[in-house]
Curated annotation (Swiss-Prot):
Belongs to the RecF family. One of its GO terms (cellular component) is cytoplasm. ATP binds at residues 30-37. The keyword DNA damage applies. Keywords: ATP-binding, Cytoplasm, DNA damage, DNA repair, DNA replication, DNA-binding, Nucleotide-binding, SOS response. Signal peptide: none annotated. Transmembrane segments: none annotated. GO terms for molecular function: ATP binding; single-stranded DNA binding. This is DNA replication and repair protein RecF. PANTHER family: DNA REPLICATION AND REPAIR PROTEIN RECF (PTHR32182:SF0). The keyword Protease does not apply. The RecF protein is involved in DNA metabolism; it is required for DNA replication and normal SOS inducibility. RecF binds preferentially to single-stranded, linear DNA. It also seems to bind ATP.
Length: 368
């Protein structure tokens, strides 16, 4: 899939913008604080209905307006789709082909994106919540049912934690009802995650071996807070541990086990990647991003859109070449932001170059 056209109204420093793109590489050049990242954020927002930079929607609204409108014309294998998001102080409205979508799970996945931003380099050593978010964003696009089950899980988790914080003593019968619901939704969430990580590992290892010239292997491990011996009995084991932890959870005032506490570990040649070099970290993250692209294509039949936000300068010539070779080979529409073309070691023919200045975007020349 690829974005044919994007229109922004009152989005951050863009008062109004209408732009069309190449189905291949699109490069956005400009000094810092001109709007390059805002532009990629808008594409991300149109796809996932959320920003990767802020939780406060009001920050997305142009300073002298009260509403935001984003519309995009998306070319999918199945045909052209029009996406629209309208944002105001009353909330957000999402539409597909002018039809309002009642649930996020009905909207997300229509346009898939993979974002590679500087903060992704913290994925290995950062907080577990970053790695859970990484899994959730990809799975939500690939399997809309996952978003629904995760939403149900979080709703029951909130109920259980609220009860634990307010209860003066344990009501075992009431907790049993919540435990059953939490284990049911949580087991399905974990099953989806485990399947996803197993599939992602195969793709990521292939890319990592290519980047390292066969010298390194990459493996991934889903680290569950629920102890289980096989995937088929996660529900029973989860339920048992919830019941076993009633007293502990009551005193701590929160739920001590479940997918909300799970993690993801990375290993290079069998060694924990927390102890890898900076160069190995970059190769690992690059391998993951390329694996996300190839796995989405394998599981859905359509390519995602790749957003590279000021990361090319973080990669040496070898890693840049591997990345560009992959997106060209797989026909992935790619958006690259940079302060200078000097940061790009090799640019193939057939790219579209844009200049970004103070919330305006001008095409350099149609196709280079």
């Amino acid at each position: 899939m690829w974005i044919k056209e994007l229109e922004l109204k009152h989005y951050r420093n863009y008062d109004h913008l209408l732009a069309s793109f190449s189905s291949g590489l699109n490069v956005f050049i400009g000094n810092n604080a001109q709007g390059k990242t805002n532009f990629l954020e808008a594409i991300y927002f149109l796809s996932l209905t959320r920003s990767h930079r802020t939780r406060a929607d009001k920050e997305l609204i142009h300073f002298d307006h009260s509403t935001v409108s984003l519309t995009g014309k998306i070319q999918r294998i199945s045909g052209t789709v029009d996406l629209e998001i309208n944002l105001s102080d009353k909330g957000r409205v999402t539409k597909i082909n002018a039809l309002k979508q009642a649930k996020l799970s009905d909207y997300i996945g229509t346009m898939m994106v993979v974002l590679f931003a500087p903060e992704d380099l913290q994925l290995v050593k950062g907080a577990p919540s970053l790695r859970r978010k990484f899994i959730d964003i990809d799975l939500g696009q690939i399997k809309p049912v996952y978003l629904s089950e995760l939403s149900h899980y979080n709703h029951v988790l909130k109920q259980r934690n609220s009860y634990l914080k307010s209860a003066q003593q344990i009501d075992a019968a009431f907790l049993a009802v919540l435990d059953e619901q939490l284990a049911s939704y949580g087991a399905r969430v974990m099953e989806h995650r485990i399947d996803f990580i197993n599939a992602l590992e195969k793709e990521a290892n292939t890319h990592h071996q290519a980047i390292s010239n066969g010298l390194e292997s990459l493996s991934l491990s889903y680290q569950s807070s629920v102890v289980f011996d096989k995937k088929t009995n996660i529900y029973q084991q989860f339920l048992h541990q919830l019941e076993k932890n009633h007293q502990k959870d009551f005193f701590r005032k929160n739920t001590s086990v479940g997918p909300h506490r799970d993690d993801l570990a990375f290993y290079i040649n069998g060694m924990n990647a927390n102890f890898a070099s900076q160069g190995q970290h970059r190769s690992l993250i690059l391998s993951l991003k390329m694996a996300e692209v190839s796995l989405m294509k394998a599981l859905t039949g359509d390519n995602p859109i790749l957003l590279l936000d000021d990361v090319m300068s973080e990669l040496d010539n070898t890693r840049q070449t591997k990345l560009l070779e992959t997106v060209i080979k797989e026909n992935v529409q790619t958006f690259i932001t940079t302060t200078s073309l000097d940061h790009l070691s090799q640019l193939p023919e057939g790219i579209r170059i844009f200049h970004v200045t103070k919330g305006t975007v001008q095409i350099d020349s149609d196709i280079h």
